[in-house]
Amino acid sequence: MTLDPNIPASPLDKKWTTYKNNAKLVSPANKRKFELIIVGSGLAGASAAATLAEQGYKVKCFCYQDSPRRAHSIAAQGGINAAKNYQNDGDSVYRLFYDTIKGGDFRSREANVHRLAQVSVNIIDQKFAQGVPFAREYGGLLDNRSFGGAQVSRTFYARGQTGQQLLLGAYAGLSHQIALGSVKMFPRTEMLDLVLVDGHAKGIIVRDLNTGEITSHAADAVLLCTGGYGNVFYLSTNARGCNVTATFRAHKRGALFANPCFTQIHPTCIPVSGDYQSKLTLMSESLRTDGRIWVPKRKEDCGKEPSSIPEADRDYFLERKYPSYGNLAPRDISSRSAKEACDEGRGVGPGGLGVYLDFADAIKRLGQKTIEERYGNLFEMYQNITGENAYERPMRIYPAVHYTMGGLWVDYNLMSNIPGLHVLGEANFSDHGANRLGASALMQGLADGYFVIPYTLGNYLTTQFGKKVDANHPAFEQALKETTAHVQRLIDIKGTRPVDSFHRELGLIMWDYCGMARSAEGLTEAIEKIQKLRKEFWSDLKLIGGADGINMDLERAGRVADFLEFGELMCLDALTRDESCGGHFRTEHQTPDGEALRNDEQYSFVSAWKYEGEGNTSTLIKEPLVYEQVKPSTRSYK
């Protein structure tokens, strides 16, 4: 199989304009004839559903939450990037494009990233028009702050609740279309399979999480906006319900999964406090704008009160190692540096798994009131969880799984290799390479939903006149039968181990062998352990209740079953990519000073994996990465 990214043959800065000028259009009268299914109601899903419905399409939107407002986009804290250059500090579309390419360690598709930078400027205007209360300077102008991997201030924010405010704006547009009857919303409904007819995506199989009823829905195109798969690690900053099921079930129907091993470990999270935990809490990257990260220089000082350790005995390791960026070095680099300090025995807090994030200098320079205005809700959240006052004592933080750069493979149209299956936001792979810069996830989700898919979808739909199918087609009946059997198979195991015990064990395997540091030996061992654990899962799973009605045990079991297959694919991808790049750090490939050592000669490609059936090894298909505008170079933030 040869992958065609369908990139326009124009100069980089003209590609998107050229594409839009030549894109095929669906007339208003014909838009009413097309039905679309959108799975997911976060920023990508809600913005796509509202925009496409406004254009005249009939839209069905599905989410497993009880309301679209509870999509995980609501948890994003720090901000959203846009190349507005309001600070007059040298920012531009090109600089945002280059920072994103460089931040991803030259493992993302150039054309998609440039388009993202171009449309970023429209997002802020759209959200401002929806009433999103972005922070403002004293004079009333929109404010910006700095995020990792950038030397300009381009991040717009709404205190520490940016994701919440952006999602409420998108939800307002979605609600308007629901009220008009243009969007039919299906909350508490989980996608369990993708239905193909003649090789095209024509619908989905879903389970009503309240009644347990399994039904089928047909459409002319399917859009997956289902987020990332960080919960394969069990402990992550993701909401408990976040999962890989929708994208992985599409993968098992033939959609290629790209770069699954590219996962992001966020440097500023509240450390694990005990085995009882089921998730971790993010402390926004925006805190690194004013906070300074340090550990004691001497191991014997780690148990002391931080205020008693003199300045001369503190190691501000990011400022020392990366003077040009300091505490705003990219996430992958910052996380590895924190781990390195803790591995040396200089970590603080229980188990030595923590570093300090200190605001004493910022409070002295700006005053506590200013810090409260910028980060007050984050400081309150930290105190509620830890019982410590971060105005008086440094926060303790440690890296944790946060975001996934991998996802289903898509071309320039955001369409997967399955015709009619489009993938938006974190669910696709296209924009962030091997490491995402802070404040760029919200940017991608809204860019895809508001400003990309409304232009690209017509290129597919114009080929589908007269090809409508309904849910009575034999393909739907077969998929419905298979899904029902899969659910019943889980219930019929009747073993002794609860589902969470399998998930926790899988997460530990993934963290130990496919986390911040990876090796060929460790990944090989991880694959063997996952295969053994999966076999035990299918023979010893204990579920409470049946298939009818609300059964959260059954919901989790289906998701963990997918994680147990997907985790092996992640490890296989990490094993096959015999280099270090971004968040993928192979210990065999590092520079003398411990930085990631890329191998552009052999690995400058997208790893797209094809499912080959249960028990068979997936097939690797490569999409070469072609750089017209930038020349891949050694990534340096020093």
Where are these regions (language model features)?
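Conserved redox-cofactor binding core of oxidoreductases
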Residues: I123-E213, C225, C269-L280, R288
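Glycine-rich FAD pyrophosphate-binding loop
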Residues: E54-A76
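An anion/pyrophosphate-binding glycine-rich loop and adjacent beta-alpha core
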Residues: R249, L256-N384, Y455-N459
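Core beta-strand elements of the Rossmann-like FAD/NAD(P) dinucleotide-binding domain
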Residues: R32-F34, G212-A221, N417
